[in-house]
Amino acid sequence: MVNPSKLKVDSVADVIAAAKAEPGKIDIAHAGVGNPFHLAAVLFQQAAGVKLNEIPYRGAAPAVQDVLAGIVPMMFVDYATARSHIASGALKALGVAALEERKELPGVPPIAATPDLAGFEAWPWQGIVAPAKTPPEIIAKLRETYVAAVSDPVVRQKLIEAGTEPMQSTPQEFSDYRRKEAAKWADAVKKAGIALD
């Protein structure tokens, strides 16, 4: 998202063009080193081949406040945090870090639709896990209960309103996805030289 009064861009491609014109000069806020919003910004810079000036904050709330105030022009942030600011027009959503357009942000394209950013995804995910030696029949029962819960229209709608899209993968699919994500993020962190203080 961006503060439209501070950064005159209409698309992710515009951000990339501006960043290439002035490497390291455009500020981007994040909610602290290693935070998902920070890592999304890192992955974006790597994928787009640009350098932004990262401004760390102690959490999303103060970062969003400074983007609203125009102190920093943009940041990656979750939908639940940005929803009211986007709805009011104070902030502009340029793209979503999911592979497809999100129902809660109609008309906002996925960043992956930007030329040269196919496959870009930095969407936070959550999952339900159990101890490694949990019997398969218990895992099956847990999954059955979970699927029933997220299939309930009221529960599903509440999750979507909070910016979470409930998925119903199998335990193996989720395990494969977690491994793929862990490798992607480990590579991004290593390339960026990120270390916690």
Predicted regions mapped to residue ranges:
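Short helix-initiation/N-cap motifs at beta->coil->alpha
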Residues: G32-V33, I55-Q65, A69, D78-T81, ...
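Phosphate-coordinating loops and pocket residues in cytosolic domains that bind phosphorylated ligands
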Residues: A17, A69, A113, A122, ...
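C-terminal lobe and pocket-closing loops
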Residues: A82-S151, A183
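An extracytoplasmic/periplasmic, membrane-proximal ligand-sensing/linker region
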Residues: Q46-V50, A87-S88, P136-D197
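Generic preference for hydrophobic
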Residues: I28, E54, F76, A93-L94, ...
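Alpha-to-beta junction loops
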Residues: E22-I26, V50, L68-V77, A90-A93, ...
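Hinge/capping helix and adjacent helix->loop/strand transition within the periplasmic-binding protein
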Residues: M1-P62, I111-A113, W125-K158
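Hydrophobic residues within well-ordered alpha-helices
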Residues: A41, V67-L68, G89, L142
